[in-house]
């Protein structure tokens, strides 16, 4: 009975440990809009300032926030936000955001960063 409880606990906790290694990279433009991208998953986020309008592409992805254009790769990942380019490794993890380089360990966790986004 004791082993079943421990096994159940491990099954519930281990997925959260694995997903907890993602790093959020955040920067602002000159007007105060905040943009972010997650290093491992590549998820893109943003905030707006008063008066901003959002434009969408035909596939419902965001194409413009205020005066900032968002560009995508053919696979749907974000390639450019304003003047900040985003590069990816072959496994889909983010390798570079602007001038910020991201290094990973062999098991896919973020090891270090160097540089800065803008």
Residue ranges and their predicted role:
Residues 1-22:
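Bacterial Sec-dependent N-terminal signal peptides
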């Amino acid at each position: 009975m004791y082993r079943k409880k421990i096994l159940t606990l491990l099954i519930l906790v281990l997925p959260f440990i694995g997903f907890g290694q993602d790093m959020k990279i955040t920067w602002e433009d000159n007007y105060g809009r905040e943009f972010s991208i997650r290093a491992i998953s590549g998820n893109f986020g943003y905030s707006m300032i008063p008066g901003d309008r959002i434009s969408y592409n035909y596939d419902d992805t965001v194409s413009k926030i205020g005066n900032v254009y968002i560009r995508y790769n053919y696979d749907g990942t974000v390639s450019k936000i304003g003047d900040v380019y985003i590069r990816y490794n072959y496994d889909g993890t983010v390798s570079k955001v602007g001038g910020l380089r991201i290094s990973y360990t062999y098991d896919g966790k973020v090891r270090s960063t160097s540089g800065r986004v803008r």
